[in-house]
Design a protein with these regions (language model features):
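A residue-level detector for the "anchor" residue at the start of short, highly conserved motifs
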Residues: 2-189
Length: 189
């Protein structure tokens, strides 16, 4: 048994698998997977994430022209195939990989899974990264036109169904200027 929860702007494809197994490719976006007693694989970029009894999140989103993959093991154990090698992951670990390599570290499960509860959670995250994430959830686009403000750290919990309230909060917290243009375009300086 497998359950899949897809975040906004997510595309997946079903892939052929052995009998009794399931295989999905995450083409782009973010999805949470849970499997109980069934062999299950998710392909993201050039690797397979393999699970039997686990809950995990896979994120494959363009960031600054790059497309890194981030795998977070929320519960159970995972294996990530890298050629003939397997990288073992356990609950509370996060693997980031791209064409240049990978890094395995402790995960902040609360941040990684916040979207599943209807929130975005940030801890000392540069405003530029916060805006990239906000842009996934609202129509239009926010542009930061001041490089200095882009580096400012943001911490907070924001409701996904109230994305435009974040602009007011950013404006107040950083004394930033917000210019609203037609089509949902926002200039932040």
């Amino acid at each position: 048994d497998v359950s899949i929860r897809m975040n906004v702007q997510t595309s997946i494809a079903l892939r052929p698998a052995d009998p009794g197994a399931a295989r999905i490719e995450l083409l782009s976006g973010e999805a949470a997977f849970a499997t109980a007693g069934r062999s299950f694989g998710v392909r993201a970029a050039d690797r397979w994430i393999l699970a039997n009894r686990a809950q995990f999140d896979v994120r494959y989103i363009s960031a600054g022209g790059e497309r890194p993959v981030c795998v977070t093991c929320l519960n159970g154990e995972l294996q990530v195939e890298r050629g003939a090698e397997l990288i073992a992951m356990k609950e509370g670990q996060q693997l980031r990989y791209d064409a240049r390599g990978e890094s395995l570290a402790a995960a902040d499960i609360e941040i990684a899974s916040a979207w599943q509860r209807g929130f975005l959670l940030f801890r000392f995250t540069p405003l530029a990264d916060v805006v990239d994430e906000i842009n996934r959830y609202r129509p239009g686009h926010i542009f930061i036109v001041n490089a200095e403000i882009a580096r400012l750290p943001v911490s907070g919990r924001f409701r996904i169904d109230r994305m435009d309230e974040i602009l007011t909060q950013i404006q107040q917290a950083f004394d930033a200027r917000v210019r609203l243009l037609p089509g949902g375009i926002v200039l932040l300086s």
